[in-house]
């Protein structure tokens, strides 16, 4: 303890009291570890995001990367910038992390420290004081077009199989949904949440989606349930799309079948039903799984159909890029180009086009 000198006894008393309060606060800070603080930050983060699916992912990251790591038992206030940088680099290298995986993993420690700074329990967030050399990250493996989209011949055969299935078994409403979405390119969560009021004058409004939500049980495990929420994945996801005539006809066939079965077709009624219940995203993907198996091609689900439709739109020189992105429900050009622009030609078609283009 440093010497304290004051002229008045009352001032000396206050100074001594302030000193011991400062020491007590410092001692309390030294007791804060990530293991002790994580539950408090987790509840704060849940209130901030109100997204149980995201919070389950966070909890999974905690169990995978933090729970058995000695850093969570070290006093946070004692961790230096160099300590944290070395820890982060070791995590990246030992787990062969991509850049995206690292930033997802680091959310817990970075934002926990931010919250401690806000609370006044940490003077500065040292985790925000360093950068990671990009060469440490494992490059993400690019997906081949054959894994991501239905090439032209595959799409043609897929349509034939789905149409035959729906014509022979009209109760297989998922077959109609597969056909319709090849011209819409919706997220599967948007597709299964469509209601009749969304379809008007040849256009379709996208404004809700199916969402898997999670409840954390007292023992720390998670229980899933499905619900429909009145919003899309992002604000860009709320959009109005033109319905081509062939899909409009299919919608009417679905409506006719629903009425024949005695199902409601009121404005608030769901379009795609099975046994008078809304079909789910998993149900749609089961149709794709069956069709791909019948075709003898790599397994691709609704997202492959979405990529296929959006790639076709992007390939059309008469459709503006911004219009294509609006159709997709995206605002970021990089995301759209990287994830929704693929070649749909077979190797033989590519060779033929190259011969035409590059022959001397």
Stretches found by the model and what they are:
Residues 1-28, 234:
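Short, surface-exposed polybasic/aromatic micro-patch for ligand or macromolecular engagement
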Residues 21-24, 39-97, 101, 114-115:
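Basic/aromatic-enriched alpha-helical hairpins
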Residues 64-65, 95-134, 187:
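N-terminal DNA-binding recognition helix of tyrosine site-specific recombinases/integrases
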Residues 103, 118, 129-188, 192:
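Basic, Lys/Arg- and aromatic-enriched nucleic-acid-binding interface segment
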Residues 114-125, 179-216:
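Short, charged phosphate-coordinating catalytic segments
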Residues 163-169, 257-267, 275-278, 282-333, ...:
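Short, basic (Lys/Arg/His-rich) helix/loop patches that form interaction surfaces
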Residues 193-253:
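Conserved tyrosine-mediated DNA breakage-rejoining catalytic core shared by Y-recombinases
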Residues 210-212, 328-353:
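Catalytic-site neighborhood detector that most strongly recognizes the C-terminal catalytic loop/helix
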